[in-house]
Structure formats: structure tokens, C-alpha cells
């Protein structure tokens, strides 16, 4: 399950011997957009980059494959094939390039990261190995920054984050507690969320320079989390918490101002779920998961009063700051475009247009906030 930059949502359905890409229509019907893939895709990861669907998967021998659906040629096209066993792997895109991480070889698992350039068709390793033995990692990318959250088996299984800004990896130990899985998600401005599961680990909001802010989980969830599945919608962080407890699989929302959590909507499932994935579009959150030998897709419509629209918050991080003014300047200079959601927030004066007047209003509000804080 993946959502493109234009809001179009796609779903990859796999069987033991085939796979088909579908578009999830506005009425939740599925339209096949690819021919069936011939072969097996194990543990597939789907992303949409510049309108093209890419899938990272493992074959029967746990070798990594990156392929794409070639719309013009109406065929599945292989982009990259690994040469060593890859027990763990994950895929992300910043909208221009693809980034994937994988472990190589049998135990111990060396952790590596690669960048695939769709224009050249070449995949190159990013820097050097991140760890001599790691697992349970995820990767995210935005605004020129790449982050990998992983469980470092060389350091008592603690959660770590590796941040790459185009030069070197900055590796940060997030906690001294053991963790299980580590999930990550990127905001449009290149800031990230890193969510280690297990123990009493908090989750972390991280900036490009590695500065981390911790948010504790509710007491009832501490030491009871198998996996956290994040998604961003309307400037808010939502997390589906998988405890592999048949009593509840719930969705939570973090209130950053109060550092508190609240459940959202009804319980997603009252059974043990596997391979849950979240995606969001147009104020609706979708969850796909495997349970009782079925693949299920459910949705939750976030009401207007729950989705707070913060005027001027162009990068959707829940705050108005210098980063928003920089993005606004770039938009006025026509070096970037805004999504529909960003456009709603850019029209601060509400006169039917987005122009310099809206930017002036934003700068004044930020200045007044700085004066009050001082």
C-alpha cells in the first residue's frame, strides 16, 4: 500500500506465483493497472516515485530485487539484483530517487544502504556499512536527507538512527534499552520520526542534524508493543500499535504540544495481525493487514474538527517556523510546487490567491511568537 505525491493510492496484491498492482479508487474499488508479475515476490515493499511504481522484494533464495512497472512498455522491468543473501530490507523514495537498505550475508548481518537513480538506472552504495550486525530496520528519505532506524545487534540490540545528509552517516544511539523493530517516517522538510518498539522505549522526533526529542508512550503500551506503524496526515502523527494481542489493534494520535496520546476511531482489529501497513490521503487513513488467512483493507475518515489546519504550516510539521517561510519563498519563485494540502495552509489571508501578502502574514505571526517566547 503506497500513496503517490498526487494523492493516488496503489496496492500490490501478491500470491505464491504472481503479483498485480492496483489503483485504489476514491470509492475504494480496485482497478488493475499492471499485468500480473510472473514469479514470486516475498516481503515486497512498494513506493511510488515520479508516478512510477517500484517494488523491492526477495526471491526464494532471499536475494534482493528492485523492479518497476513500465507503463509505456506494459511490462515489469528489473532495475537491480543483489548478489548476497538479504535477510532484512526496506525501500523509500524522496520523489526523485529511491533508497533501500538491506542486510547482507548470513548471520551476522552487515547493514548497508543504496541509492537508485531512475534517470541512470544505476544503484550505488551510500557510504560504508552502518553496522556489522543489525536487523529490523526501516528507511525514509525527504529533502536531501536519508534516515535508517535499526536494531544494532553489536550493541545489545539498542535502537539506533543513521542520518545521511549527502556526505557521511551520522549514527545516533537513541536509547540504552533493547528494542524489537524500529520504524521510521519522513516529513516533507527532512525531519523524521523514529519509533523503536519493545521495553519502555519512547519514540523520537529527529531533525536533520540529529537533534532528538523523545515522546513517552502511554503506560499501558510500555513493554507491550511488538511493532509501531506510523503515518502522517494533516500535520499529525498517527501510529497503529501492534502488540500481537488479540484483544486490540488500535490507532493512536500524538499531540505534540501536550506530549500525550489518544486513540482514534474504533479498534482496527480484535485479533492478531501481521504485516500491517498504513497510508493516508485526503484526510482518510487506510490500514492493510493480514489476519485469519485474509488480507484486509480498512479505512478511517478523520473528521474536520480532528484534522487541525494550521495556517502557514507548509511543511506539515505542526509548527510555524523559518522552514515554512523558506518553502513559501521557493514557491513564490516557482522553484517548487505545493500539494493541495499545502495550498490550503499557504492561503493565510483567505483572499482566494496565494501571494506575497500571505508570506508577510506568516512572517509576522512567527515574529510575534518569537517575541512572546522571549
Give residue ranges: language-model regions.
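Entry beta-strands of beta-propeller and related beta-repeat scaffolds
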Residues: 7-11, 51-55, 96-100, 144-148, ...
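Trp- and S/T/G-rich repeat-edge/linker motifs of beta-rich repeat architectures
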Residues: 20-39, 68-84, 115-131, 163-177, ...
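Blade-level signature of beta-propeller repeat domains, shared across WD40, Kelch, NHL, RCC1
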Residues: 272-306
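Cellulosome-associated attachment modules in secreted, modular CAZymes
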Residues: 305-374
Amino acid at each position: 500500500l503506497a500513496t503517490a505525491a498526487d494523492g493516488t493510492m496503489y496496492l500490490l496484491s501478491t500470491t505464491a506465483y504472481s503479483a498485480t498492482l492496483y489503483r485504489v479508487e476514491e470509492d475504494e474499488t480496485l482497478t488493475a493497472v499492471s499485468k500480473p508479475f510472473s514469479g514470486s515476490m516475498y516481503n515486497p515493499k512498494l513506493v511510488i516515485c515520479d508516478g512510477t511504481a517500484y517494488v523491492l522484494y526477495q526471491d526464494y533464495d532471499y536475494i534482493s530485487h528492485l523492479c518497476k512497472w513500465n507503463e509505456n512498455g506494459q511490462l515489469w522491468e528489473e532495475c537491480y539484483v543483489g548478489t548476497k543473501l538479504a535477510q532484512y530490507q526496506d525501500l523509500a523514495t524522496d520523489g526523485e530517487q529511491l533508497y533501500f537498505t538491506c542486510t547482507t550475508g548470513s548471520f551476522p548481518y552487515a547493514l548497508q544502504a543504496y541509492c537508485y537513480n531512475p534517470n541512470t538506472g544505476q544503484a550505488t552504495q551510500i557510504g560504508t556499512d552502518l553496522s556489522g550486525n543489525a536487523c529490523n530496520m526501516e528507511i525514509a528519505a525527504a529533502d536531501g536527507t536519508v534516515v535508517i532506524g535499526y536494531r544494532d545487534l553489536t550493541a545489545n540490540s539498542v535502537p539506533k538512527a543513521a542520518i545521511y545528509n549527502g556526505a557521511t552517516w551520522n549514527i545516533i544511539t537513541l536509547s540504552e534499552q533493547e528494542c524489537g523493530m524500529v520504524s521510521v517516517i519522513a516529513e516533507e522538510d527532512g525531519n523524521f520520526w523514529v519509533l523503536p518498539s519493545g521495553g519502555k522505549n519512547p519514540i523520537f522526533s529527529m531533525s536533520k542534524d540529529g537533534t532528538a526529542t523523545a515522546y513517552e508512550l502511554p503506560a499501558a503500551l510500555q513493554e507491550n508493543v511488538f511493532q509501531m506503524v506510523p503515518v502522517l496526515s494533516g500535520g499529525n502523527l498517527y501510529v497503529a500499535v501492534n502488540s500481537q494481542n488479540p484483544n486490540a489493534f488500535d490507532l493512536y494520535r500524538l499531540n505534540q504540544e501536550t506530549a500525550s496520546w489518544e486513540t482514534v476511531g474504533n479498534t482496527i482489529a480484535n485479533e492478531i495481525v501481521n504485516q500491517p501497513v498504513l497510508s493516508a490521503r485526503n484526510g482518510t487513513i487506510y490500514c492493510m493487514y493480514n489476519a485469519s488467512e485474509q488480507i484486509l483493507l480498512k479505512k478511517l475518515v478523520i473528521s474536520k474538527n480532528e484534522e487541525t489546519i494550521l495556517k502557514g504550516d507548509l511543511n506539515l510539521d505542526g509548527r510555524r517556523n523559518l522552514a515554512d517561510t523558506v518553502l513559501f519563498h521557493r514557491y513564490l519563485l516557482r522553484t517548487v510546487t505545493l500539494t493541495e494540502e499545502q495550498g490550503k495552509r499557504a492561503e493565510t489571508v483567505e483572499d482566494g490567491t496565494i501571494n506575497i501578502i500571505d508570506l508577510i502574514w506568516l512572517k509576522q505571526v512567527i515574529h510575534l511568537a518569537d517575541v512572546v517566547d522571549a
